[in-house]
Amino acid sequence: DNPDVPGCHIYMEAQIFSPDSKRMVLHRSAHPHGSDPLDPEHQYFLCDFENDGTLTDLTDECGVTAPSLSPDGNVFYYFLDELSSKGRVVLKKPDLKTGKCEERGVIESDGTFAPAYFFYPLSTISSDGKRIAIATGLRKKDSQEWPEHGLWVIDVETGEYRLILHGEEFCNLHLQYCRAKEEPHAILIQHNHGSRLLYKTEGAKSGIGKGHVAALDPDSDFALRKIRKSDDPNADNTGFGLDLHIISDDGSGWKTLPVGRDGIEFCQGHQCWRGESTRVIASTLLFDTPLTATQELVEMESFPGNVHCRNNSAGGKRNILSRKVIPAHFLHFATDRSGSRIVSDYESDDGEWHLYTGKLGAMGDAADLHFTLNLGSREKSPWHPHPFLSPDGRKAFFNSSASGQLQAYCLELE
């Protein structure tokens, strides 16, 4: 309704589609990685594909974030970020028919920690629709020190909540409930070893400290480095980087995925469940030289325990899906609900954004990936495309600012 306000899709791992592929949630005055919590223009809308893409307002207040659509597509949830004003976050549930909104719960403190300063812009809902998980920064109760990051789980009916995970290195959790009905408690998480991202306070002022690790260690800057554990504090081999785990939503039952942080292969920080299965796909980074690298798509099965090794993990199975595409430069991706189709963006050596689509076979098979669309140069469209598929796999969605304005796009595949 305002051509001067940018719009885009919500991050590709978000649960924002109805299972029949007829409706989805998107937002305006946002960018592909989130939004400004103080921007009143940032709002969520419901897009109805059966009604020519008509948009219906879902929110009308400042501070909306972390949306989720229930697995049956009938209930929409979002959170209100009141961290800076009241030190809390509020779970809300608007009626999709009447628009009337009700408060379902408030997260303030678990007795030791309270949410603070940073709200991860995505939530994730369990496959039985009973619980939602979010991630925030943490501060100790009645203290101005904000030393850690945490994963909260809230019951959508009772409003009861628990802090199930916390630590300095959980700054970018990419939390994702498994969508398999038989695994309603399993959550995929990301552990950024070496990351701190501390927020420091000086009186009433606060600021972001240095030390965030997205995928590599803080000093890498795409330099070729060996990443491994070392007992020598002066060693260059730090053990920094990220790896992936699956945990239960009570904080127990750790499992590990056989990928990354072995000195050769790094996780990029983009991963998702393969449809409604219990397998996970992640994008990796392997340096050929200090300035050149390939980015593969790897499918994995987890194994029990909280350990960190790649190919020597007993019981851990993996398959390089993108091995038939040379060179591989896959970054952000998603599958359909059945886990039989995939879409990914691809940054070519000449700086062009490409869109690839394809089919997935049995565990062990290479993906049938093929070039589908040129999305333009990264110079003209620097924002990440973050593509994903409708649950039925018939539509692909991506972001682009090639026109001069960031917008959300849809591509009919069949």
Model-derived segments and spans:
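Blade-terminus and WD-like Trp-Asp/Gly-His loop motifs, strongest in beta-propeller folds
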Residues: 14-23, 28, 67-80, 117, ...
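Blade-level signature of beta-propeller repeat domains, shared across WD40, Kelch, NHL, RCC1
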Residues: 383-414
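Beta-propeller blade signature
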Residues: 44-50, 91-99, 147-159, 232-252, ...
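Blade-loop segments of beta-propeller domains
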Residues: 5-16, 28-80
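Conserved blade-ending motifs and adjacent loop-strand segments that build the rim/top face
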Residues: 258-264, 320-333, 364-389
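Short, conserved, GDST-rich strand-edge loop motifs in beta-rich repeat architectures
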Residues: 29-39, 81-83, 134-147, 189-240, ...
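Loop/turn-rich, solvent-exposed surfaces of beta-rich toroidal or solenoidal domains
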Residues: 274-295, 302-308, 318-365
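Asp-box/WD-like beta-propeller blade repeats and closely related beta-sheet repeat scaffolds
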Residues: 57-142, 146-149, 163-170
